[in-house]
């Protein structure tokens, strides 16, 4: 599936920090979505890191924090700083350092910005970066990224009730797949994911409150009508 055989040999990299990973994702995204302002200034890059939409998790970082993270990325040659402008501007160098084609960069970028995604979600969310013909082509590039000597992505265990597996990037280090195994690791179909359990607890509380409200309403109406609702009914 690799359509660019002349790519350089990938380099071994250390684990990135979450902010370093976010910066790389923002640089690739803005390269495609706002090319007129790319390479990005520090201000624009910080705004992209703190963006509320299309980000998971949402961050709130300062320009000083972004500057420190940029220094680390420049040391890895993943980011380059331009010198043709009075305002420092930054661009990514992921294709050459990682040795992967633009299609794979697009998928990796979405994972860096949005967290775990299914192949279908990746195809949809990467449309502005690269148009994949079908889900199979997305999966082919993901499989290549996962099969590298230093894997860049991993297929997560299917979540309970989910129809598809999700994928996650490994730029920030390996993940414990057991944390994502859900009912498969819990040993039974009765296991409930934490989010669903919290939703069930909230629904139970709502129902309890509703029953209490209705009981109070019945008691008030009975008092107004002179009816003793606690009295036993006729035995026959």
UniProtKB/Swiss-Prot annotation:
It comes from the Bacteria. It holds the Pfam family DUF480. InterPro entries: DUF480 (IPR007432), WH-like_DNA-bd_sf (IPR036388), WH_DNA-bd_sf (IPR036390). Coiled coil: none annotated. Belongs to the UPF0502 family. This is UPF0502 protein Bcep1808_3727.
